[in-house]
């Protein structure tokens, strides 16, 4: 597929899944280096008898949370949970996370400390290590990106494509 056609398709107003489908088509011909291609909540890299499972999600202020309606601790905890739940749903045990924060001046200091307390609470509860990330300033909204990493036996991966009604995760 030609790049211009893909760019046009990606700029049209679409559902999340049709947009992801366009991205998968655009990048599908590139090498995956052992990772499973786009199409599930996580990607999987099989390493012998073990699988490394990775997921990422973004949370944007006024889209995924309202600063006035949720405490900073709640937002921190939720940010981790939405990611490690994807890893767990694939049959893996969450083990590590990367956290990137873009904070306006109004969220630096007390709000950021509360956020980190909530994020820490989730990490401590589920035995997840924070192993890296990034911080930057933003103009007026909070943007949060979390990468969750988990491990599982290669033969225990639960894929959305194989899910059946009544399955228990």
Region roles according to the model:
Residues 39-40, 83, 94, 141:
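Short Gly/Ser/Thr- and Asp/Glu-enriched loop/turn motifs at secondary-structure junctions
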Residues 49, 59, 94-169:
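Glycine-rich anion-binding loops of enzyme active sites
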Residues 8-71, 90, 99, 122, ...:
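Extreme N-terminal cap/leader segments of soluble proteins
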Residues 44, 83, 91, 130, ...:
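Residue-level signal for inorganic ion chemistry
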Residues 39, 70-74, 78, 110, ...:
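Residues at secondary-structure transition points
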Residues 72-96, 117-125:
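Small-aliphatic-rich amphipathic alpha-helix that forms the alpha element of a beta-alpha
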């Amino acid at each position: 597929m030609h790049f211009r056609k893909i760019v046009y398709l990606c700029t049209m107003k679409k559902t999340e899944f049709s947009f992801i489908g366009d991205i998968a088509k655009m990048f599908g011909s590139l090498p995956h280096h052992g990772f499973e291609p786009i199409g599930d909540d996580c990607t999987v890299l099989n390493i012998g008898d073990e699988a490394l499972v990775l997921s990422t999600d973004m949370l944007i202020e006024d889209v995924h949370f309202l600063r006035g309606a949720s405490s900073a601790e709640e937002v921190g905890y939720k940010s981790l949970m939405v990611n490690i739940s994807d890893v767990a749903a694939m049959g893996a045990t969450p083990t590590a996370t990367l956290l990137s924060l873009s904070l306006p001046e109004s969220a630096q200091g007390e709000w950021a400390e509360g956020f980190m307390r909530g994020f820490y609470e989730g990490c401590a509860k589920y035995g997840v290590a924070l192993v890296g990330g990034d911080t930057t300033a933003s103009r007026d909204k909070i943007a949060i990106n979390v990468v969750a990493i988990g491990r599982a036996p290669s033969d225990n991966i639960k894929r959305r494509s194989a899910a059946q009604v009544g399955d228990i995760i």
